[in-house]
Amino acid sequence: MQSFPASLFSDGPALRLLGLAIKAQESKGELSLDDEIRRYIRTVRGNWIANWNCSVYTASGVLEFTADSVERGEGLAPFPPEFREKAERAAGDVNPAEYLRMLAEIVRILDREPSPEYGELPMAGWEFQLTFPYLFGFDAILMDEGDQEFADTVRSAVTNEHPYCAEGAAAYTTEAQRALVLFPGPDALKSRLYWATRDRLQELIATVNEHMQREHP
């Protein structure tokens, strides 16, 4: 069999896309494969680092390369266990190489479309966690510090990282600002995070900015 780097199939875009395909198949009609891939494309396009590291076009190429490796070799047997299991589940009764090529073609076709707005295609839970990881993580901090005022909790979270707080502080405010733009209105992200209303997100931004102006003039 043609050699291939196992790490390419231990993680990365092929494994992610197979996971989304399985999720759609096992949702009993609640999820559409096309829509899950549209969300994947929207997520990659919306993150400069992700897009620079592995564009959607490249991800479709990885699927094609995988299909070639399966077809020219010993099937899925030489692949890492997690990849093999997901490929078998996703393909079902279809030849795995054929399924991977079909998935690659779907990705390529949908990549030609503009990304749908969130009002048109709501943000999925997995997409939310990738788009707002710091706000999602802040939820746990609020649970631990539930007796404090909201601004005090924000202040403590930033101060505890000082003087190495720049990365976290920037991430909190960036994600909060992005949430306010993407989800205008008083509820903002409340449907995903009970506390993340417009007022609370604005308070978070103001509190972090206050710390930065005071400690990092």
Question: At which residue positions do the language-model features occur?
Answer:
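Short terminal alpha-helical segments
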Residues: 1-45, 100-156
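Function-determining sites in protein domains
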Residues: 1-4, 82, 159-202
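Amphipathic alpha-helical interaction modules
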Residues: 27-76, 137-177
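Amphipathic alpha-helical interface segments
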Residues: 11-31, 46-50, 67-79, 87-98
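An almost-null, non-specific background feature
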Residues: 18, 24-27, 72, 92, ...
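Charge-rich, solvent-exposed alpha-helical interaction surfaces
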Residues: 20, 36-43, 61-69, 79-86, ...
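Amphipathic alpha-helical binding modules
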Residues: 74-130, 188-217
